[in-house]
Amino acid sequence: GTGSNALLKNPDGSFYGCGGWGNFIGDEGSAWYMAFRAIKLCYDDMDNFRPSIYSTERVWELIQQHFNITTRLEILDHCYAKFDKPFFAGLCAKLAEAAKEGDELCKSIFRETGEYLAKHIIALLPKVQDELVANGDLSIVCVGSVWLSFDLFQESFLKNYPNTNLNLD
């Protein structure tokens, strides 16, 4: 939940990765990133910096509940002095519930997550060795708490998942 990456191990022992660089560089597809996106989208809307096409009301309520804050400024302690990445990522569980209840902003964050997770896999495809595909040994294993909410991003994941026969030249 606090990070996201994809790893490839080829038959010759070579490894390749995509993502997993941490929250400062990019953890797209992780619970932390979804929490960050929810806060960013909500705050940008409330600042009138980048108005959201979806209501941010429910997400703001969830942020207030999760971080036990009443004003927007109070989030700063959780982003800096008291930063706790697993706690921050814990907001994602509340976002999942709101998405299941129909909140459009939360649903959009999960759709975006499906795209990111598919892109992790797509990024590694050029590195897949022919032997791995020929033997039928190419398995994609999905682990982590974000996958417990696969129903919320399955459509966007599969839409963006590579439709390929893996003809590698």
Question: Model-derived features: where do they sit?
Answer:
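ATP-binding/phosphotransfer module of carbohydrate and carboxylate kinases, centering on a glycine-rich
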Residues: K40-D169
